[in-house]
């Protein structure tokens, strides 16, 4: 514990907060190219492989966003749009790919929660 004299001479150093959105430059969405197509296994109680993408953003940051929904058409060197939002059981995955934008297609024949997965409105009978 510092003495009063030491505090007068030096003061207290403020804690620096870590920036969780460093890769996105405080932007709501960011565009990137996908150089690799890996999958990851989640943390302990869960076991299904999670579909993720290694994406190089326009500002040269490499991030690992999650691809939501069942199945995807994403390949190497396809353009994707990234938004925030982490995946709780996958360490290091702090963003999501946006379906139905750029080269990542939406989910066909999806009826509910369509806006989250880039699905078109079904034709009424």
Swiss-Prot record:
Gene Ontology molecular function terms on file: structural constituent of ribosome
Protein location: Mitochondrion
Signal sequence interval, chain numbering: none
One GO term describing the cellular component: mitochondrion
Gene Ontology biological process: translation
Annotated Pfam families: Ribosom_S12_S23
Record key words, sorted: Mitochondrion, Ribonucleoprotein, Ribosomal protein
Region (Disordered): 1-51
Extent of Basic and acidic residues compositional bias: 10-23
Chief place where the protein resides: mitochondrion
PROSITE patterns membership: RIBOSOMAL_S12 (PS00055)
InterPro entries named among the record's database cross-references: NA-bd_OB-fold, Ribosomal_uS12, Ribosomal_uS12_bac
Purpose of the protein: Protein S12 is involved in the translation initiation step.
Family: Belongs to the universal ribosomal protein uS12 family.
Name under which the protein is recorded: Small ribosomal subunit protein uS12m
Originating species: Panax ginseng (Korean ginseng)
Gene it is expressed from: RPS12
């Amino acid at each position: 514990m510092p003495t009063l004299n030491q505090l007068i001479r030096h003061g207290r150093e403020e804690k620096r907060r870590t920036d969780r959105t460093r890769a996105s430059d405080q932007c709501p969405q960011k565009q990137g190219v996908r150089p690799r197509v890996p999958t990851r296994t989640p943390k302990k109680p869960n076991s299904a492989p999670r579909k993720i993408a290694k994406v190089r953003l326009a500002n040269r940051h490499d991030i690992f966003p999650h691809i939501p929904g069942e199945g995807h058409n994403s390949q190497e060197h396809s353009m994707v749009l990234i938004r925030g939002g982490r995946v709780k059981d996958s360490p290091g995955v702090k963003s999501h790919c946006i379906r139905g934008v750029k080269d990542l297609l939406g989910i066909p024949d999806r009826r509910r929660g369509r806006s989250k997965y880039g699905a078109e409105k079904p034709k009424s009978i």
